Amino acid sequence: MARSFAIAVICIVLIAGVTGQAPTSPPTATPAPPTPTTPPPAATPPPVSAPPPVTTSPPPVTTAPPPANPPPPVSSPPPASPPPATPPPVASPPPPVASPPPATPPPVATPPPAPLASPPAQVPAPAPTTKPDSPSPSPSSSPPLPSSDAPGPSTDSISPAPSPTDVNDQNGASKMVSSLVFGSVLVWFMI
């Protein structure tokens, strides 16, 4: 558009320069009346074609956006049934207190055993005195007659010696007494 305008201006200047030169004629006495030189009408520049209207309007929206999917209906939770009331756990009874062991009575101090009564010492029985056997008188010799001055036999020698049965009785009696004493001591300890 600017180029066409510059070309038109150049053409106008050239035409004006050509027509403005004077003719080479001889001088006359009467000058010719000046001819009004009207410049030719300026060439009008070609009409600038208006640019076509820019139709950059956005295309009409033909398809409406799909409706947003409605959220799924919230399913109402089932009514919460109250949990069955469970009875509180029964507290287990405390363990039985261990009863103290029964106090055992202190052992009764047993008295020291009494020394056993020693059985009475057995009195040795007197040995029977045996008379020495006198030699039998010979038939030829006659026994001497006792003189009147010689003492007669004593009563001790004449008393009979204790028989063996008496000695046995004394031993049995002493054993019986000692066994009775020993038995009574045992019974006393048991009580």
From Swiss-Prot:
O-glycosylated on hydroxyprolines; noncontiguous hydroxylproline residues are glycosylated with arabinogalactan. GO terms for cellular component: plasma membrane; side of membrane. The modification 4-hydroxyproline is found at P23, P26, P27, P31, P33. PANTHER family: CLASSICAL ARABINOGALACTAN PROTEIN 9, LYSINE-RICH ARABINOGALACTAN PROTEIN 17-RELATED. Residues 173-191 form a propeptide. Predominantly expressed in flowers and at a lower level in leaves and siliques. InterPro entries: AGP9/17/18. Belongs to the classical AGP family. Glycans are attached at P26, P27, P31, P33. Coiled coil: none annotated. This is Classical arabinogalactan protein 9. Keywords: Cell membrane, Glycoprotein, GPI-anchor, Hydroxylation, Lipoprotein, Membrane, Proteoglycan, Pyrrolidone carboxylic acid, Signal. Proteoglycan that seems to be implicated in diverse developmental roles such as differentiation, cell-cell recognition, embryogenesis and programmed cell death. Residues 24-146 have a biased composition (Pro residues). Its main location: membrane. Residues 155-172 have a biased composition (Polar residues). It is found in: Cell membrane. It comes from Arabidopsis thaliana (Mouse-ear cress). The keyword Magnesium does not apply.
